[in-house]
Amino acid sequence: MGIIIGLIIVSVALIISLCSLLYILTSKSQKVLNEKKIKEAKNERKKILSDTYREINEQKKSFEENLQFEKNKLEIAKQNIENENNLLIKERAIIIKQQEAIDVKNTDLDKRIKNYSDKREELIKRLEIISNMTSFEAKAELMKNVESKIQYEIVSQIKQAENLAHARAKELSNNIILSAMERFKTDIVNEKTTNLVKLPNDDIKGWIIGKDGRNLKTFEQLAGVEIIVDDTPEVVTISSFNPIRREIATKTLEKLLIDKRIQPIKIEKELKVQEKLIDETILEIGYQVMDELGIHDMDKELVKLVGKLKYRTSYGQNVLLHSVEVAKIASSIASELGLNAKQALRAGLLHDIGKAIDFEKTGSHVFLGVEVARKYGEDEVIINSIEAHHEDVAKESEIAVIVAIADAISASKPGARNNSIEDFIVRMKEIEKIGNSIPGISKTYAFQAGRQIRVIVDPVTTDDKDLAGILETLKNDLKNSVIIPGEITITAIREKREILVFN
């Protein structure tokens, strides 16, 4: 028991000794560690202080350099200000001297003005004594003389300016017109009233005439033309002042000759076919003209009337070619003057559009042209250009004036017009117009310069006993209205057909 207690005591003592030793060792290790950390902290502190001192020194150096730079700038600016100030002082001194000189001159000028005024007053008084006129009267007389002289000079200058302006305007207008005429050229097509149809041989003439002349009479009656079958070999002449009727008849006869079937029924049928074809041709011609001139917004009916002008002549001049030429000349002049060239082109093309229908309707070509232009939506400038190109009304725009000038240029070209043919056509139209105005007559055709007249009477409203009265009325009307040289023959045709169709 005592041993155990002794062992326990020894063990406890040993444990205590070990703990003491461990504590001592631990304390020493901690102390060494702390001393190391303190040393490292001191080194870090020294490094931080060193870096801080270095950075402060660098900033201080930079600041001192900047400060010195700013000081230098201030010194330079100060020097510049001093220089400018010195310059201003010198300039001010110069200005003061100049002002003093001006003051001296002004003083001298005032003295001279006063002397001049005194002398002027003295001179006026002496003049009043010499001339027995007051200064007001003398001034009025002087003004009168000056005004008279100035007025004369002004009138002379105005007259000179007007002469120069007229000369310049004439030269300019001549250049514009010459330029327009040189730019466009239109062939002159002489008017004719006959077409020649070539035959394969002279035996065909018998076919054309037909039994007892039936084919020839039917053809002439339905076509409204005269067919001349004479001794000219292998040729038949179709005569009519109406170019469309003449063209339809020519095409019909040529087609019948190809088919080799010439008889009244075939003639009537082929005439209707050719009438339809000529209408299509007229429209095609109209659209060709529109393409040539660059017009793409014209009413179809107006386009058709333009095409119809190809078959119309005036004083021997083809109206379509004339209208196209007028359009181009008017467009060129308008372009030179800075006006609406497209509007001038359109107005020039349509200025004679009434001639496409004046042989079908009553009225002048101007009146009819205005009527159709307004009907198919042309604007007032175009309408006035049509209405005014023969001076029937006043021209309301520059375009109307240009169209009238272009029309005159085209018409006045050498060889462009033939008055004798135009007079002949006017006479033939008048004969047909008089005949168609008589009640009972449905169609009138004039041939051989009006010496041969064929009238077709309405078989429903007239009978055979009325023919003599109708012819007498026509004869008297023609005598009173138209001068026709030579002997006149009037043939009246009354034909009634009755067709019965049954099963």
Swiss-Prot record:
The cross-references to SMART domains, in alphabetical order and at most eight, read:
HDc, KH
Q: Which UniProt keywords apply?
A: Cell membrane, Endonuclease, Hydrolase, Membrane, Nuclease, RNA-binding, Transmembrane, Transmembrane helix
- Pfam families assigned: HD, KH_1, RNase_Y_N
How the protein sits in the membrane?
Single-pass membrane protein
Subcellular localization, as worded in the UniProt entry: Cell membrane
Which PROSITE patterns does this one have?
HD (PS51831), KH_TYPE_1 (PS50084)
The cross-references to InterPro entries, in alphabetical order and at most eight, read: HD/PDEase_dom, HD_domain, HDIG_dom, KH_dom, KH_dom_type_1, KH_dom_type_1_sf, Ribonuclease_Y, RNase_Y_N
A GO molecular-function annotation: RNA binding
Ranges for domain HD: 319-412
GO terms under biological process: mRNA catabolic process
E.C. code: 3.1.-.-
**Could you tell me which residue ranges the KH domain spans?**
193-253
Q: Transmembrane segments in this chain: where? A: 2-22
Respond yes or no to whether keyword Transferase is given for this record.
Answer: no
Highest taxon listed in the record's lineage: Bacteria
Q: Keyword check for Hydrolase, yes or no.
A: yes
Q: Which GO terms describe its cellular component?
A: plasma membrane
Main role? Endoribonuclease that initiates mRNA decay.
What's this protein's family per the entry?
Belongs to the RNase Y family.
Q: What is this protein called?
A: Ribonuclease Y
